[in-house]
Amino acid sequence: TLVSGDNNQALAIGGITNGVTNLELTNAYATIANHGEYHTPIFYTQVIDHNGNVILDNTETMETGREVLKDTTAWLLTNAMQDVLTSPEGTGGSANPGNTPVAAKTGTTNDDRDTLMVGYSPYYTVGFWGGNDDNAIIRSTSFSNRVWKQVMYRLHEGLERKNFTKPEGIVQAVVCKKSGKLAIPDVCNAD
């Protein structure tokens, strides 16, 4: 439940008074990755032994999703979060696995007690939280980016490179940096 003090930037990474679990936060990002379609989260789909035999099968519990975001809204969020990993100004450049398109959000609490990296590709959504059980200050906050990068890299080894799909209804245009209006060639370029 949100309270009035929860209206801040930390909301995007679960920084609310009563908190969210890593599973809930990761599932929120999975909903964006699924074009705005929400599915109740499950921890695993199958457990397979070293011989390739399915020991546990959780695929029957997977439900049909329901739309909670427009696909266009989900794509705009994805497009913005791709900059976190690809833009020189982005805070997650060191987390880009390089072998798949990704969108993500980094996060660190003001007092360096928690670090977070949550994001997705067209295939997988991964959330990573790092901190101490006793809420002590952590020595480094960049390790969440490194762990997330390695997990995403390994998950995508051998997979066909797939881009995020832009839905119908998205209109792209060049905007003049000075006026904020549509750019006019030779009058106001997008610089």
Which stretches of residues belong to each language-model region?
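Mid-domain, small-residue-enriched loop/turn segments at the edges of structured enzyme/sensor domains
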Residues: 1-26
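A penicillin-recognizing enzyme superfamily signal
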Residues: 18-191
